[in-house]
Amino acid sequence: MPKRVLQGVVVSDKQDKTVVVRVERRFTHPLLKKTVRRSKKYHAHDEANTWSIGDTVWIEEHRPLSKLKNWIVVQGEKRAEV
């Protein structure tokens, strides 16, 4: 079975070797017929502490690394400096 890959934005990088990634999904509400956005936060492993807040990253399912970490960061894009 292939591993799931999700795209999201880093919202926290305070922990060592861990980032918190917010993944947003969109769906049509069955009753209102409107597009609704829902988000969920995932803790992901970042071995080199490369990613910082605002970066767009792709995370992939992995074996459990701790109580909360079941994902690893596989690639991403740095946020543009202003």
UniProtKB/Swiss-Prot annotation:
PROSITE patterns: RIBOSOMAL_S17 (PS00056). One of its GO terms (molecular function) is rRNA binding. Belongs to the universal ribosomal protein uS17 family. Gene3D superfamilies: Nucleic acid-binding proteins. The keyword Iron-sulfur does not apply. Part of the 30S ribosomal subunit. The keyword rRNA-binding applies. One of the primary rRNA binding proteins, it binds specifically to the 5'-end of 16S ribosomal RNA. InterPro entries: NA-bd_OB-fold, Ribosomal_uS17, Ribosomal_uS17_bact/chlr, Ribosomal_uS17_CS. It comes from the Bacteria. This is Small ribosomal subunit protein uS17. GO terms for cellular component: cytosolic small ribosomal subunit.
